[in-house]
Amino acid sequence: MNTVDMQQLKAGEVNLGTSIMAVQFDKGVVIGADSRTTTGSYIANRVTDKLTHVHDRVYCCRSGSAADTQAVADIVHYYLQMYSQQYGAPPSVHTAATLFEKLCYENKDQLLAGIIVAGWDREVGPSVYNIPVGGGLFRQPWAIGGSGSTYVYGYCDATYQEGWGKDETVNFVKNTLALAMSRDGSSGGVIRLAVITEDGVERLFIPGNELPRFWEGKEVLGQDMNKTFTHLAQMEIEA
């Protein structure tokens, strides 16, 4: 009997080679992501929205296979709608994160999905949960994921402070994502943010020409070589 080769099937899939992030602050959470979607080296979409609504005040950030993460998010959204109908109350952020973790773990051989779940609920207030590829559930004050995250862990460790308000947290997420996008070839485009509090969800958009700019380096050797060639040319003219 023929079997499906999952590795071959997934070889040409569309991936969210990405930078995603969620940070908790005193009255809510800020989530953010870049907008680049790739198929190998080809940029399939430059303005993807990787912040996915799963319930009123619960969102997820998606990294990995676009098809896998969309399917998982749709399933969780369905179950949370059923939950709220059955119990007459909105689900907690932990309930949503547990559903994501269960689906990712039980199907880890078929899925490539890294998820960050964040939001606000009446039980605990703001919270952030990280579900890495393969499953697992970790509550953290901040979480980053995707291919761009490897370049900014040190920046996050050195910069993050407890007790921040909304404005400081938004700037932290914006700067972190801009740094990741400047180093990771699979991240890019624009930055999409969402601020989730008891009052609701506020969406923010930062176009590419308004991203924070940091030191981007310069080729010192190249400048020295130009000076050398100029000097040699002058010597030849004088000779």
Locations of the language-model features?
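Long, low-complexity N-terminal extensions
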Residues: 1-239
